[in-house]
Amino acid sequence: MLSYTPLANNEPSDHKALIVYLYNAFKQKDYATMAKCYHSDAYFRDEAFELSGKEIGAMWHMLCQRGKDMTLEFSVSEQAGNITAHWEPKYSFSQTGRFVHNIIDAEFEFKDGLVIKHIDRFNFWNWSRQALGAPGLLLGWTPLLRNKVAKMAMTNLVKFMEK
């Protein structure tokens, strides 16, 4: 497990280092360290989840546990004090066994040296056709499938957190 101490100040370079640290922990599937990168009042959103607080750490725990074959490449950028990341996980989707290469862009906001807001954006149709096959290809652009996937993801997270 990587050791982690919150950074001393809120300078952008420290924020960039925190995000590099977050994704390096993800590469190691070190969900406990990842959770420590987030403020207790943090907010996270992507195409499948809208989470806050401890739910974020639980999501990373679930994804690390289920993503046994996951590999990850990432880059972190800083422009005008704004920190963004581009990351590309490759993994077998646990529900279908299908290979997924997702391309994600992330934006971050910080409070007290930790992530307070994390927004991930990716092309849901591209993801759904890889993860789900024909149903994703045909319906991945519709709100119907997007909502179904989000509901299923949240149900899985709630069950995971109850363990």
What are the residue ranges of the model-derived segments?
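Hydrophobic alpha-helical core bundles mediating ligand binding, dimerization, or RNAP-core interactions
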Residues: 19, 23, 38, 60, ...
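Short, low-complexity N-terminal intrinsically disordered segments enriched in polar/charged residues
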Residues: 1-30, 36, 154-163
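Hydrophobic pocket/interface hotspot
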Residues: 22, 34-35, 42, 56, ...
